[in-house]
Amino acid sequence: LTVPLADFFGTTDETGTFHTNIPAPILFCLVMLCVGTIAFFIYTFYDRKLDASLDAEGLEPEEPFRMKDIVYIITNKGFWLIALLCVLFYSAVFPFIKYAADLMVQKYNVDPKLAGTIPGLLPIGAIVLTPLFGSLYDRIGKGATLMVIGSIMLIFVHTMFALPILNVWWFATVIMIILGFAFSLVPSAMWPSVPKIIPEKQLGTAYALIFWVQNWGLMGVPLLIGWVLNSYCKGPVVEGAQTYDY
């Protein structure tokens, strides 16, 4: 979506040279962030309203947060298994998506205007597949097995993208669809596994700590990818643009 937006709002100068409008996709993202912020405040308002109604009805309030909850959670070996799976899994997906459009152009010779279409299949597919896999988990259980299958699929996908074979758009599309299955399969079994190892009264703290660990990975892995590209994968400059050998 980024490149089409930049091209749609681009301009042509007096010499006939076309210039993309970089601020357009940035503004679009800003609008989405604002919508998300407004939604957060609306949620907070209704959450406080619910707490007030529970107090008025004389219901017992939720047990307050205590620092020893953190100690209990971080000393739970099962928590760290889930947290490490989370950080490694999402660090192998989200930073990859950031570079995926450029990968489509550099390796699979996809038109830059369409390069975001193939990676865009991932979130679209997740919308459909995640509820289906969640329903499957509810029926058969076996969360560990489902997570292992999804992780193996993810390893297979990155291996196929790394190998110099079938550098054509349809192959990239097939591999991206498989990544969509893995991206939906692992979370649908991973997140419901947390209540199995953490008491309900500490679930909020556990999820917060998992996201804290995850964000460290999402901060470091893109830096690592960028460093590897700049250090070992630079190709020739073509028409003023740096190319990379993925």
Predicted regions and their residues:
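Flexible cytoplasmic inter-helical loops of multi-pass small-molecule transporters
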Residues: 42-68
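Extracytoplasmic gate region of multi-pass secondary transporters
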Residues: 76-127, 187, 191, 221-222
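Helix-loop-helix hairpin linking two adjacent transmembrane segments in secondary transporters
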Residues: 1-47
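Helix-to-loop junctions at the C-terminal end of transmembrane segments
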Residues: 129-142, 229
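Transmembrane alpha-helical cores of Major Facilitator Superfamily
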Residues: 1, 87, 120-124, 208-216
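Small-residue (Gly/Pro/Ala) motifs that create kinks and tight helix-helix packing interfaces
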Residues: 2-10, 101, 133, 221-229
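A late C-terminal transmembrane helix in Major Facilitator Superfamily
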Residues: 200-234
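C-terminal transmembrane helical hairpin of 12-TM major facilitator-type secondary transporters
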Residues: 143-193
